[in-house]
From Swiss-Prot:
This is Protein nucleotidyltransferase YdiU. Nucleotidyltransferase involved in the post-translational modification of proteins. It can catalyze the addition of adenosine monophosphate (AMP) or uridine monophosphate (UMP) to a protein, resulting in modifications known as AMPylation and UMPylation. Keywords: ATP-binding, Magnesium, Manganese, Metal-binding, Nucleotide-binding, Nucleotidyltransferase, Transferase. Its cofactor is Mg(2+); Mn(2+). The keyword Nucleotidyltransferase applies. ATP binds at G86, G88, R89, K109, D121, G122, R172, R179, D258. GO terms for molecular function: AMPylase activity; ATP binding; magnesium ion binding. It comes from the Bacteria. It comes from Salmonella choleraesuis (strain SC-B67). The keyword ATP-binding applies.
Length: 480
């Protein structure tokens, strides 16, 4: 089957990009590709059979219909206007036309210098490329909206970060790479007509049902706010910390994008800071909902030339509504509740207080809770708490709450185990795969990808265990 590509961004949004070709790496080689995603997208297996070089995966060749461009965007970093930020190392190769008429961006990260590279070198390193591939696929199989990873190319090109590393490329796929920062770029350049063109592009291709509706811009922004709210709710319930929620890392479609200093909670710590460069804790775990709203407010500001402020403020309310509604639904599912009762939040917050005080493992606590039997006061979770009297008191109230619903244990446990993962991408697991890959051994990278495809399956190996102490102390930075 022949793949078809279009170039809607290039054709419809002039002055938002620079056309250029990727810059290949030295001795590039394909080390991993996403076989399941490739099958879903009808990508011929022959494209991955590259024995001499890395082909399209390393930017050495293009497929028919591809018209590569580097997109320009700006944004706020750590709450401060930073001006033009990129795309300094990513190139949109083209947009694949799918059978249902939709499209999918093929975006090559680490593709070389662009006019927007600022002081950067246009490269990505193997370490960060592996992390992003693992994280995006882990999030997908957890059911959280995200960009996807299609392939990784390694090389012998030296790249200087904190230490000397080697260059790599990631083929990232997404329905769109449109970010809040695209709108900010033209708003601060005092080009409101281009901001409106971006909004028109988004509506035309992703919300076509509103194209001819007079209030289309308000409806569109309401949906952006709601999608962002639902996304943040998903992050908070699964214990995901993004680490660098700058406005240029926020997706118009409500996707998780730009995996840098991310982390999943090990010990439950609501103030967890995954990014060691975040000295003020702006992007700490429990501040993510507030930061997302702040970012939406920055996006709303760019829309003031063609949306009234009152309408924008009403639309922003959709964020909080979506966040709280979706978070409440998800947490009730995690606790095994089928109905909403007035004291549910009290019970949840009491559990969080216990977990924070004891340093309980976030994912394992909820997974173990999913094995609760209403009539049994014993629980394997009890042995993980030092203050067993406090746990027993909470557990009695929890079982009493379960008995208020006419749901048997088997059905409830089944629901809980569909939303409480046994496996998440802990930083130490990613680091183990990286360490092996940097020595030329890709087996752990491939196997970890397989493990992450079944996050809700119980395991008795270390992929589902608490991290070793050294694994809790790994520092992650924006360096990638």
């Amino acid at each position: 089957m022949t793949l078809s590509f279009t170039a809607r961004w290039r054709d419809e949004l002039p002055a938002t990009y620079t056309a250029l070709l990727p810059t290949p790496l030295k001795n590039a080689r394909l080390i991993w590709y996403n076989d399941k995603l490739a099958q879903q997208l009808a990508i011929p297996a022959s494209l991955f059979d590259v024995t001499n070089g890395a082909g399209v995966w390393g930017g050495e060749t293009l497929l028919p219909g591809m018209s590569p461009v580097a997109q320009v965007c700006s944004g706020h970093q750590f709450g401060v206007w930073a001006g033009q930020l990129g795309d300094g190392r990513g190139i949109l190769l083209g947009e694949q036309l799918l059978a249902d008429g939709s499209t999918l961006d093929w975006h090559l990260k680490g593709a070389g210098l662009t006019p927007y590279s600022r002081m950067g070198d246009g490269r990505a390193v193997l370490r960060s490329t592996i992390r992003e591939s693992l994280a995006s696929e882990a999030m997908h199989y957890l059911g959280i909206p995200t960009t996807r990873a299609l392939s990784i190319v390694a090389s012998d090109t030296p790249v200087q970060r904190e230490t000397q590393e080697t260059g790599a490329m990631l083929m990232r796929l997404a329905q769109s790479h449109m970010r809040f920062g695209h709108f900010e770029h033209f708003y601060y350049r005092r080009e409101p007509e281009k901001v409106q063109q971006l909004a028109d592009f988004a509506i035309r291709h992703y919300w076509p049902q509103w194209q001819d509706v007079p209030e289309k811009y308000v409806l569109w922004f309401e949906e952006v706010a709601a999608r962002t709210g639902r996304l943040i709710a998903e992050w908070q319930t699964v214990g995901f910390s993004h680490g660098v929620m700058n406005t240029d890392n926020m997706s118009i479609l409500g996707l998780t994008i730009d995996y840098g200093p991310f982390g999943f909670l090990d010990d439950y710590d609501p103030g967890f800071i995954g990014n060691h460069s975040d000295h003020q804790g702006r992007y700490r775990f429990d501040n993510q909902p507030s930061v997302a709203l702040w970012n939406l407010q920055r996006l709303a500001q760019t829309l003031t030339p063609f949306i009234e402020i009152d309408a924008l403020n009403r639309a922003l309310d959709r964020y909080q509504d979506a966040l709280l509604t979706h978070y409440g639904q998800r947490m009730r599912q995690k606790l095994g509740f089928f109905t909403e009762q007035k004291d549910d939040n009290v019970l949840l917050n009491e559990l969080f207080s216990l977990m924070a005080r004891e340093g309980s493992d976030y994912s394992r606590t909820f997974r173990m809770l999913s094995h609760t039997e209403q009539q049994s006061a014993s629980s394997p979770l009890r042995d993980t708490f030092i203050d067993r009297a406090a746990f027993d008191a909470w557990f009695d109230r929890y079982r009493a709450r379960l008995r208020t619903e006419a749901v048997d244990d088997a059905l409830r446990q089944q629901q809980m185990q569909r939303v409480n993962p046994a496996v998440v991408l802990r930083n130490w697991l990613a680091q183990r795969a990286i360490d092996a890959a940097e020595q030329g051994d890709m087996a752990e990278l491939h196997w970890l990808h397989e493990v992450l495809r079944q996050p809700f399956t119980d395991r008795d190996d270390d992929y589902a265990s608490r991290p070793p102490e050294w694994g809790k102390r790994l520092e992650v930075s924006c360096s990638s």
